């Protein structure tokens, strides 16, 4: 597939789809006719395999009852650990360093409760002012639980432009009073990729544990955690990994920390052969499974089984290659068709700094998103003035990208957006 130059013609889009080596995966997903879904960075589409694995799990309950914990196609008792083997290639880690459990926010509470140990002058947590609000709420809660004031002990790196973070500023903020760092791998608005390898090395030079929120990176970009030495990470599985709304999240802990007792424990923290001894002294699992707390939500895990099969076949490197190409193509069309429509491109243009979605800014963003939906294009609004468009490598086409930009041009030229209020819905 040619890297450059792109062409603005419809024929170019069709030809690009013919050359797409991942095109067959589009048939794996339920896509509505007359709808262009560009919101996979918020909630991925349902695949037929994810549907099948959920139905298989329901049938296991029907057929086996309580014995479903150890019988059936996917015995529930070992499911979280077994899925770790399929996630490992996506983040470049060992399977024993990964567990499917909790949600992003509860997993943040888990890793912070484990790794945040304020002592002496090292009492502060370093985050950033652009991160997702739930991360901040969790950090503030954990600081309060230590009897400290979040206003004093939570440091947020400021953005120079309101969209991105400068890694030099992050490193400069790694001062002697920082005990722990939590940063997004990819910023949820602008899609900027942070240099996790460099930031981890700089944190470790200063004796600081560092972890990342992978919600907007896992399934979209490759990671090499074994090489980089990241201490911990958390993520959701319902965006690029297409495991469904409310699906169980994921947690990574570097194996060098396995001797550390989890900050939050429960009976599923136990070593499997000891769990049903019902002792009041925890014998923790000797891997990331120790970071589980309660009984796993089996039906919220089940769709991930089918979804991860697709990722194994497609390969994260091929997915990233297409993602980069199709987002470059969309940026080219936006520049060609929408230069006089008041849009500002808010995402990095460099491939190595751009995640899986495009971020446009416009004063009328909220009602432009409503107009797009009225025209069959599903975007994502993010306050105060952002439009996120995610052409997902597994199921979006170049033709869809071409059509969506043309529709956006029509909306702006005809001022169709003025039919709507310029404020977000209950769920943006």
From Swiss-Prot:
Pfam families: KYNU_C. InterPro entries: Kynureninase, PyrdxlP-dep_Trfase, PyrdxlP-dep_Trfase_major, PyrdxlP-dep_Trfase_small. It catalyses: L-kynurenine + H2O = anthranilate + L-alanine + H(+); 3-hydroxy-L-kynurenine + H2O = 3-hydroxyanthranilate + L-alanine + H(+). GO terms for biological process: anthranilate metabolic process; L-kynurenine catabolic process; L-tryptophan catabolic process to kynurenine; NAD biosynthetic process; quinolinate biosynthetic process. Its cofactor is pyridoxal 5'-phosphate. Its EC number is 3.7.1.3. Pyridoxal 5'-phosphate binds at residues 104-105, 132-135, 213, 216, 238, 267, 295. Pathway: Amino-acid degradation; L-kynurenine degradation; L-alanine and anthranilate from L-kynurenine: step 1/1; Cofactor biosynthesis; NAD(+) biosynthesis; quinolinate from L-kynurenine: step 2/3. The modification N6-(pyridoxal phosphate)lysine is found at residue 239. Keywords: Hydrolase, Pyridine nucleotide biosynthesis, Pyridoxal phosphate. It comes from the Bacteria. It is an enzyme of class 3 (hydrolase). The keyword Hydrolase applies. One of its GO terms (cellular component) is cytoplasm. GO terms for molecular function: kynureninase activity; pyridoxal phosphate binding. Belongs to the kynureninase family. Homodimer. Catalyzes the cleavage of L-kynurenine (L-Kyn) and L-3-hydroxykynurenine (L-3OHKyn) into anthranilic acid (AA) and 3-hydroxyanthranilic acid (3-OHAA), respectively. NCBIfam families: kynureninase (TIGR01814). This is Kynureninase. The lineage of its organism: Bacteria, Bacillati, Bacillota, Bacilli, Bacillales. The gene is kynU.
